[in-house]
């Protein structure tokens, strides 16, 4: 599904969360190659990407590194596992592909935001629902699309990605 990440990040119900992070979070610039999250370590923060590109990788049991996704400007990033279960280590490493400006916030502050009232708590449900839909679409794409189709989808989402990475 083309541009599903953007549809998820720009979901109308998540606008409040985005604004909260942008108003109360901390802005930093990740340099190319700098890691935001490390596989196997507990990550206590999530972020909104102002501009730039982040790559998600996972190291398998044999030590091979697999690229499992990207997030782009205008999207959320972080370890959903840690948001749901705070002591759960990250399943992926998230690193900057190019200089990337993000606004991050500790998950504890995000949880305080969610706990403000029932209506805001529903935002957490929306976040988890949208994350599930995103992952389900990616799973279906992985099984149903050819490598070429996945490549074209990535180019459609981010036409200038070839300036930052080598696509094999």
Where are the predicted features?
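A short beta-loop-beta micro-motif enriched in histidine and acidic residues
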Residues: 23-24, 35-45, 64-65, 87-90
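Conserved short histidine dyad/triad with adjacent acidic residue
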Residues: 26-41, 71-75
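Glycine- and acidic-residue-biased ligand/ion/polar-headgroup-sensing regions
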Residues: 44-57, 73-74
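Cytochrome P450 core scaffold surrounding the K-helix E-X-X-R motif
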Residues: 58-63
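Cyclic-nucleotide recognition modules
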Residues: 67-125
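Polybasic "coupling" helices that flank or enter modular domains
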Residues: 96-97, 108-168
């Amino acid at each position: 599904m083309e541009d599903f990440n953007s549809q998820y990040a720009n979901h109308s119900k998540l606008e409040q969360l985005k604004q909260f992070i942008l108003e109360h979070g901390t802005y930093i610039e990740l340099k190319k190659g700098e890691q935001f999250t490390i596989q196997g370590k507990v990550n206590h923060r999530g972020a909104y990407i102002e501009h730039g590109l982040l790559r998600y990788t996972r190291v398998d049991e044999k030590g091979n590194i697999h690229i499992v996704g990207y997030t782009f400007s205008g999207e959320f990033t972080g370890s959903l596992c840690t948001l749901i279960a705070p002591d759960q280590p990250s399943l992926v490493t998230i690193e900057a592909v190019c200089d990337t400006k993000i606004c991050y916030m500790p998950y504890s502050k995000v949880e305080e935001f969610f706990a403000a009232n029932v209506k805001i708590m529903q935002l957490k449900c929306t976040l988890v629902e949208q994350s599930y839909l995103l992952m389900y679409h990616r799973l279906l794409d992985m099984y149903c699309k050819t490598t070429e189709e996945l490549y074209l989808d990535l180019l459609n989402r981010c036409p200038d990605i070839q300036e930052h990475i080598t696509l094999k």
